[in-house]
Amino acid sequence: RARILLITPNLKGIKDGLNRIQPSLGLMTIAQSLINNNHIVKIHDTALEGWENKVDLGDNKVLIGQTDEEIENVIREFNPDIVGISILFSNLNESGHTIARIVKKIDKKIWVFTGGNHITNSLIDYQHNITHPGDDIPLIKDLEDKNIDLALVGEGDFTVVDLVNKIINNQDISKIPGLLRQVTRGKYFNN
């Protein structure tokens, strides 16, 4: 049995604007798949839990959500083996990387993966540019972060169960469909 923390990052929003928090429906389905396989799961939404905290970022932007210290306390208290970070949109990306950094600061052995629309679309952009000579090939920045071990692309409900089971049993993960990993800077492997 693994302890898995599924976490939604702080929200970068518009100062005095209408800033909405999206329900973590994707994380709920992933959590249920993991629970059905006897894993211990916690979902934590840092933006929702820290909704009253707004940090002025300048340029009419604010960061809404928990402080790094509060996030670190949640991670330490739950003591996960694996952390999954849901990055649905680009306005969550920077905070997602902050969470990954906090996790690895706590314990470098904790597996960290990211998933959601943002990483799936980053892969699509990367694949498009590879097949169109003359276009710049973008880096998949999520995987250029040393604190992120891999990414799940597409629907992760079943992929995540296979991934977690293989991680806790020290088995090869290289053939799991839907995994995206960095090979070297700017080169990625997608199953």
Task: Set out the residue ranges of the language-model regions.
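Nucleotide donor/acceptor-binding cores
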Residues: 2
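Short polar catalytic/cofactor-binding loops
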Residues: 8-14
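Glycine- and acidic-residue-enriched helix-capping/strand-helix junction motifs
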Residues: 14-27
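Glycine-rich beta-alpha loop elements in corrinoid/cobalamin-binding modules
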Residues: 33-34, 40-191
